[in-house]
């Protein structure tokens, strides 16, 4: 009886956990959102351009750049 439960557990575990991670790739929108969040976090570092420091009508560049003097908005 114990062997039966062990086999059942291994079968269910392998089908749910391993199957979910191997057979189903990460959806592209979720992956894209994660990459955008990482880029936003890079821009939020203290030495990078911050959007809230920019005057009205100016924005930080797409590529995060280090600002030595001023908010470096374009």
Curated annotation (Swiss-Prot):
One of its GO terms (molecular function) is toxin activity. It is found in: Secreted. Its main location: secreted. Keywords: Cleavage on pair of basic residues, Disulfide bond, Ion channel impairing toxin, Neurotoxin, Potassium channel impairing toxin, Secreted, Signal, Toxin, Voltage-gated potassium channel impairing toxin. The keyword Nuclease does not apply. Contains 3 disulfide bonds. Residues 1-19 form the signal peptide. GO terms for cellular component: extracellular region. Expressed by the venom gland. Residues 20-41 form a propeptide. Coiled coil: none annotated. Belongs to the scoloptoxin-07 family. Inhibits voltage-gated potassium channels. This is Kappa-scoloptoxin(07)-Ssm2d. It comes from Scolopendra mutilans (Chinese red-headed centipede). The lineage of its organism: Eukaryota, Metazoa, Ecdysozoa, Arthropoda, Myriapoda.
